[in-house]
Amino acid sequence: MSDLLNRRLSLLGANLPLLKQCLHGIERECLRVTDEGRLAQTPHPESLGSALTNEQITTDYSESLLEFITPALPDPAQVLESLEQTHRFVYSKLGDELLWSPSMPCTLPAEEDIPIAEYGASNIGKLKHVYRKGLALRYGRTMQCIAGIHYNFSLPEALWPLLRASDGNEQSDRDYQSAAYIALIRNFRRYSWLLMYLFGASPALDKGFLRGRPHQLEELDAETLYLPYATSLRMSDLGYQSNAQAGLTPCYNNLASYTDSLRKAVGTPYPPYVEIGTHVDGEWVQLNTNILQIENEYYSNIRPKRVTYTGERPIQALTSRGVQYVEVRCLDINPFLPVGIDLTEARFLDAFLLFCALEDSPLLDNGECGQCTDNFLTVVKEGRRPGLELRRDGHPIELKAWASDLLGRIGQLAELLDRAQGGDEHAKALAAQQAKVDDASLTPSAQVLARMGEHEESFIQFSLRQSRLHAETFREQPLPTERQQAYETLARNSLAEQSRLEQEEVGDFDLFVGAYQASILAISN
């Protein structure tokens, strides 16, 4: 335990009410499927509103890939309640369709038959669609159908000046806050393998997902591929394999180096993309021919974030106003849970992220960067292997020993959160994770394989059974009339807003894309 962490724990202990002001938000992606478990080919239901302008129900890559977004709230229980209500509303509009329960996709149609999300005729709507066409061109449509949970978290704004004073730091509050979030991200890189062990839930997938590509997976049955000790094949290197992004590892030494590396990637041509061009047969196929079309194309396990103004790019927001929160992007959907995540997981994530924020976080050199990546990939592919060793400070250490050590340190943050909020919910959440470390059969990834074995099911059969169970849960609990009407109003207003944007649109789309592209080059640190 570092002296720095001890000092910061004492500071928090003297300011416990502040810990009630952390903010949390969840984004859950899930595929719409037919009642037989095939990808829905229907358009995004109009009764859910506009995917462009509805702030709570939208689409991700595909017209069939829904995304539910909660507001940012101080209590994770409220966040999960909001997410659950959104599921209940959506099920009131889905007819016979289902929401697919796990992260790895259902039976997919031919690559060209996976529908790309549509956002209407406004320039911003077209830009979102062309960006997704570019993703299809660069990475294939199949990979874009993987779903996940994103967990957004911020520390209280009032805490940063106290920490800065305690550290004797002379930066501005804004710069100190940004540096502290980047330090959190460095520690997240060091320790996120633990989340993969505890919450990874994708040890198997449908054989058709790989489209005949070479792989190192084993056959579980005629339709299912898996690895016996895998925790999260979703986060393994069978997912995104991008030669263009291979050399792009944004430096997490400070905010400026991070935004600078992304800005360069958005402005640097990549020869294979240049060869294709932005148009084929007069149609847009990608926004530009650079390493990244836009910043969000960079695939990472965690992102520093700042809420953007209308028309503002993420890098512009970060550069001008600093980091506001982090977005954790490596969490699998738990197929046993109706909304894919529960309060126990959320409470542990809060303690884990607080630990990452407050523990000493030295800069990562190239050697440690590689070690972090290796540990992460080892755990997603074989995290439950008995006696598995990772590397800490260049030396081997058994996963179980390191995990128990980390949980002991994170436990001090859980204790503080419980003191601030009353009760012992965070301590219980921590104990549930220690139980998984002691007994790997309790992990979600082990449970998935165990259930498939018990029922003699393929991945698709298991997933469809879970999806139907959750559908029944939601359909049997319609929303109270008042809440249902609030969602209906949100949907109607979003459709009206999209219509207004389209009617008021001025200017040519090509010029709009040019201006959008130029905006990134005008930013200076």
From Swiss-Prot:
Q: Which UniProt keywords apply?
A: ATP-binding, Glutathione biosynthesis, Ligase, Nucleotide-binding
Q: Which GO terms describe its biological process?
A: glutathione biosynthetic process
Pathway field of the UniProt record reads: Sulfur metabolism; glutathione biosynthesis; glutathione from L-cysteine and L-glutamate: step 1/2
Query: What's the domain of life for this entry?
Result: Bacteria
Quickly give the catalysed reaction.
Answer: L-cysteine + L-glutamate + ATP = gamma-L-glutamyl-L-cysteine + ADP + phosphate + H(+)
Gene3D superfamilies named in the record: 3.30.590.20
User: Which molecular function terms from Gene Ontology are attached?
Assistant: ATP binding; glutamate-cysteine ligase activity; metal ion binding
EC main group: ligase
| EC identifiers of the protein | 6.3.2.2
Taken from the UniProt entry, a GO cellular component term is: cytosol
Asked whether the UniProt record includes Cell membrane among its keywords, one would answer: no
Q: Does the keyword Lipoprotein apply?
A: no
Pfam families on file:
Glu_cys_ligase
Task: Family membership, please give it.
Answer: Belongs to the glutamate--cysteine ligase type 1 family. Type 1 subfamily.
* Name the record gives this protein: Glutamate--cysteine ligase
- In its UniProt entry, the species of origin is given as Pseudomonas putida (strain W619)
